């Protein structure tokens, strides 16, 4: 700054500071303008040192002048500043900038005349080029000065800053003044990184060079001696000419200005680039309805500079288009200004115009003094004179408008002072600039209700408060319920804190400013002596008079201090006086936000009567409630509240003290559901080892969080009086009640919000929060750690959460969440198993709970036998004798718990390892560790999914449980050590379709090993006897039969009672296994039985399946096959007749074997077979299911995916960081997919509606993603009549079709990705390939053909179905060829032209049309030949 100050001497600086920026304006030049100018010059690659002399200033003006026409506002300001500075150096008296410019113009005109005169005098004697950088050296030769790095640097900066916006062109023009083509190429090379732009430029240059060559053909013959060749286009572009040649051409007589020509070409190219980078035509620049005029002008000129047009055209555009494209409000004003208005005048006139609402007001304000008629007013001269008196909406002073006001912005409406709307929307007529009626009465304390406080407050609110005394402000906190009542004036900061002050006998309005050191008032006379002073503020420096010891009264408080008087935009009371009157800034923390709670829809609050209580309980409750009422936790209520919940009292465990309990069961049933914020409890094995640890407990946790106001009435309860002496006392809760279902979730979320700022400020602290237990760990020294803990306690206290010392644990071992934490290990708090002679259900439940808790660290704990005792519904107090196994299990557990066991803490740098052992009877135990014998945690697994299972399956489930648990605790999966050989696993995995993925694992030889007890053969066993088995049962009587027929003619049938179809099928298999040799082939038609046995269970809850397993283990080889219905398969048809006798009536359909043949050939889908061969869908489906080509993974355990024609599965998948929404038509595999901008409900719903508009969608099946569960998607489904189903969370199989299509789609995208620039293109290409270019699957179709086929078939089937149902309403009476009697009535199955197909009892017959009478079934029986029915022909 010192260096810049040297530009002017002291005397010159005084002159400088007297010159006004504009004629009649208040602002004058300041030192800062010189500083700004010197910085700006550096950007233009001009030496700021030139500012120090008048000669330097003249050079700068000469450099800037050519760019003025096309330059920006900044360039113009720079020119004006340098011109004024030149006048100061030259000691030319000027009052303002305009005068300075006029003086410069005069001087330039004079010097021009002189130069012309001199040129005339000397003729063309001087050949010196005026073009810098070509200069004449002392020997008179023309030499080239290379373009300076400074110029190049300025050029690079311009391009980097402005990219290719219109400003680039004037800057290029200015920087390349007089340059040779070589210099210009240097400039272009420095910005060569912008390849696309440079390519466009190159093309323009090539076109121009070709055009030059066309217009300047080469002269024939040799060049005369001493003459230069003429430049070609490529010479001008500097590619085929040397620097010497370029200088020669430029300085020749007559010259060929190759530099200027080349520059012109480059500017043409730049214009094209600019148009591409900011492709707006000047005609498109229109002022928006609410756009400030100044912004519009900036846009207009920016685009104007990019236009390729002559200066005359540009001037015309400015004159006409600028006004023409302004918005209606500005246009009215501009037209009133008349045609010759300057831009400056236009901008002044249009200030503050912001949309239609302002029009009348701005005009009225700007012309408030005009009393002439409207027509006179609109004349330009009148308007000009009136324009000066504008008044500011913000501070109410005249001479400037709100946009330029330096006073802080007033909150609320500028017209009426009220909040909630802006001035343009104000309905009041009269603007009230001085705002006597401020939005709150002065000097009075203003009370907030808690809602009001919350309605307009961020978390912290700033208030200015005076104390009556000058004590510290420790007590000045708001009470927690939110009502604030101070005994001193309180000013909120929703408005500017303006107050009335009394000084020197005058009343003034002043702003309380805690950021100002001094008190500054606008011009006024004060008694006493004063000192001159300069003070700095946001708007620069101002000169003031300093008066000391001035008495001043602020809102009734007297103070004496220093007051500064000067040109301040607003009166300011600074800290020097505010501290005297005890004014402080307070930040009362806003009360905890209440979470809105509702009852379930259509329900009312609980109305449960209070049951009688003993005297001592009533006394205890009265005492507790009085105390709670004092603390504001509950409030008394009147009889208007109709709700009630019973209350009672119990003694606390450890004392004689009573505890109040409210039975909120009824209210809980009626309260809305909450999302549990924490899904599980934190586990110590997941804690990292910390140097310092503290455990805190929040006292009265729930009672520190307010309950939603509208919900409080439902928590009403009554304390009865003894002997009903008086009506009971009624209360309701103001805080979260214990025992109410919403308390945990609301407390957790409030606590998280409160701890968040503390967590952010202290990232080095680890804070685990579960309900009211806090674990805080850090690697700080204990002293620093404890300081942090105190900060945390203070932070919680500010929100009203106490952390009682009694439960504040500073030294290990720490008791936390039922665990004991030591510095380098952890365990569960000591567990004592009770010794009892008799055990009740409740005792056993508690015992199992304790053992489950201990199993986290004590390996080998079992509870299966104890749990078996609890099966069935029993009363809690029922005594249960322990079985021998349970006694044994309990004794083993006692042994395990005798030795205390410890776990260690997690080390993120080491791998996790999980080891599993089999304990027998379906129980497993596991340990997770990082170093051998140092367990992080242990556990057990004994869950049986499904009735029949085997060890491999259970092991897989255990692995998945442990993997999930590890992800929750440590965020990663461990490596597994499993007691199963790789071969066994591989066998199982390849054979069993439902085997799921398990993480990385290795075999560990810990007996007992897991093995498969038997294996089923893949091919029929040659030479072994084949048993066709079947069973049938009657649903009503529950009687059944099971049996078999063998290929050797053996057969057996047994009768069963109280059975089902499924049981009889299994019974038949059991019979076959019992009666067969060591090798056997078994053929069944039961999918159910096949499904159970193929999964190779080794134990089952079903006695029958267990017996089958025993038999299977005894066999050497077993082949089990499934066939669909029994027609045409000899053994099966026979056995079916055997077992069906008297059990079921099956109509065998001829079509089955034909359908099977057809399916083997073409693999047609079940729908096609059902319609072609008239099969029931279940049979057709089973044919497909038994085909190994169509069914890669066997039948699904829980039935197949639903393949109805209207079902689609939707899912989002991610690729390259983008979201692809995929919809798959389940039955055909046809895909619709799209890249969507975001995974939101809005986008999903839009996609869904598009899908429904293209295809018949009846059901969509999605996962539980938030976009699919959103209200928008539900609404779209409702509107389009689509049923929405959700998958099973965390079970990818429930979304199997779309998941596999995602993989397929990604695979195809991978194949075509390099053919497309954008992912969205690649996605559509992949969809096309998948739908139409990949054939295969059912029917050998492509997915596109298949969906059309399925939908068409579906329509036809429905039509056919309608006809069939119609046909079935008819009965047929027919004659046999040899028998003259009419037979019937038979059922009509099909009616053709010449014959009908009928079903009489179980026979299907074809009868010629002429021998059949078809009638409607009116329920009448045939009486004889001439019966009425016989004559009702149906043709």
From Swiss-Prot:
Stretches the record annotates as Dimerization of protease: 489-493, 537-543, 576-588
Binding sites annotated in the UniProt record for Zn(2+): 1159, 1163, 1187, 1190
Keyword Isomerase tagged: no
Oxidoreductase among keywords: no
Coiled coil location: none
Residue segments, region Interaction with membrane phosphatidylinositol 4,5-bisphosphate and RNA: 14-33
Binding residue positions for Mg(2+) 2: 1030, 1065, 1085, 1136
PROSITE patterns, sorted: ASP_PROT_RETROV, ASP_PROTEASE, INTEGRASE, INTEGRASE_DBD, RNASE_H_1, RT_POL, ZF_CCHC, ZF_INTEGRASE
The EC number(s) this enzyme carries: 3.4.23.16, 2.7.7.49, 2.7.7.7, 3.1.26.13
Spans annotated as Interaction with host AP3D1: 12-19
Motif (Nuclear export signal): 16-22
Span of zinc fingers (Integrase-type): 1150-1191
Annotated segments matching region Dimerization/Multimerization of capsid protein p24: 277-363
Regulation: Protease: The viral protease is inhibited by many synthetic protease inhibitors (PIs), such as amprenavir, atazanavir, indinavir, loprinavir, nelfinavir, ritonavir and saquinavir. Use of protease inhibitors in tritherapy regimens permit more ambitious therapeutic strategies. Reverse transcriptase/ribonuclease H: RT can be inhibited either by nucleoside RT inhibitors (NRTIs) or by non nucleoside RT inhibitors (NNRTIs).
Top-rank taxon: Viruses
Region (Interaction with membrane phosphatidylinositol 4,5-bisphosphate): 73-77
Start and end residues of each stretch annotated as Disordered: 106-128
Annotated zinc fingers (CCHC-type), start-end: 390-407, 411-428
Residue numbers marked as site, Cis/trans isomerization of proline peptide bond: 221-222
Region (Interaction with Gp41): 7-31
Site label Essential for RT p66/p51 heterodimerization, positions: 988, 1001
Catalytic reaction equation(s): Specific for a P1 residue that is hydrophobic, and P1' variable, but often Pro; Endohydrolysis of RNA in RNA/DNA hybrids. Three different cleavage modes: 1. sequence-specific internal cleavage of RNA. Human immunodeficiency virus type 1 and Moloney murine leukemia virus enzymes prefer to cleave the RNA strand one nucleotide away from the RNA-DNA junction. 2. RNA 5'-end directed cleavage 13-19 nucleotides from the RNA end. 3. DNA 3'-end directed cleavage 15-20 nucleotides away from the primer terminus; 3'-end directed exonucleolytic cleavage of viral RNA-DNA hybrid; DNA(n) + a 2'-deoxyribonucleoside 5'-triphosphate = DNA(n+1) + diphosphate
Residue span(s) of domain Peptidase A2: 508-577
Domain Integrase catalytic: 1201-1351
Sequence segments annotated as region (RT 'primer grip'): 814-822
Protein name per Swiss-Prot or TrEMBL: Gag-Pol polyprotein
UniProt gene name: gag-pol
